[in-house]
């Protein structure tokens, strides 16, 4: 965007080793098939997000897989002092519980990556999370030793994200979102962002969107004055979902959101129902017609027939989007959603996804 030519590095070799940064225990090694799958998935995701013209993708297997042990020790090992390596935070924090030679040498491999990209591609700046500082500086030192102290080589680290409550933002802290729609659907992705805390939302607008400073300041003011409208959260969810899943993914996510909120779910497809109610309470039922009271009790949506009758009569029960107030009503599993599901809503938005067997 600013005239620079970014290079995205895929860890075809380092992914098979495992980075010890930020970990208290040894990583479990992945199989060759898992590493290959991750390489392909990451490459496809980057192309989808950024296109194919504005950046370059490199895989460190291009050079590291050709490096034999003797050359590794002679050409690079001699340039690293063990006492300096031990003093790196990532290693020092692991010494008490132990660290394998494999993970101990990871920083050398990442240093070689920076050296090759600097020498062959002219890459001058490496960007990574704050836990990568030691690995990045190891690369800068290696470049200066091999190419001279005047060789331009720089590192920039980005602080690991923390939520307002102090917990980490990421998969290790739970509740992570993925770029792959097979792992996090567009609806789940949209919901993740729209449910962000008022204390975090402005920060995320700055991190994850391309909105102007004026637009973000306006949304910050709205959040302060009218937090119940959640204008900033809605804009954040729209911008990030559109960037990752495209206009079609955003529209689908909003359609599912609106349908579940209003209760008008008739027009949702089976796939959209599965997206929207993936994390809702679930139950199973047979494919035969059944009295609504018996159906509610058999699926454990209601604790008793008395409670079921009361809720039905009071208009608290909806079957596939329709309010049913007759205790004589029969639930027909084949009537909607291709006979795969019956959707029960109790009250305003308490959904249960009943799978038909």
Residue positions per predicted region:
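N-terminal catalytic cores of NTP/NDP-binding nucleotidyl/phosphoryl-transfer enzymes
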Residues: 1-19, 126-133
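Gly/lys/ser-thr-rich phosphate-binding loops in alpha/beta enzymes
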Residues: 1-8, 14, 44, 158-161, ...
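Short connector loops/turns at beta-strand edges and beta->alpha or beta->beta junctions
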Residues: 11-15, 111-114, 163, 182
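Short acidic, glycine/serine/threonine-rich loops at helix termini
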Residues: 18-22, 67-73, 167-170
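A charged helix-plus-loop insertion that forms the helical arch/lid used to bind
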Residues: 20-36
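Short, hinge-like loop/turn segments at secondary-structure boundaries
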Residues: 24-28, 74-77, 173
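Divalent-metal (Mg2+/Mn2+/Ca2+)-assisted nucleotide/phosphate chemistry catalytic cores
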Residues: 31-32, 38-39, 43, 47-163
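Conserved nucleotide- and phosphate/pyrophosphate-binding catalytic cores
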Residues: 143, 147-357
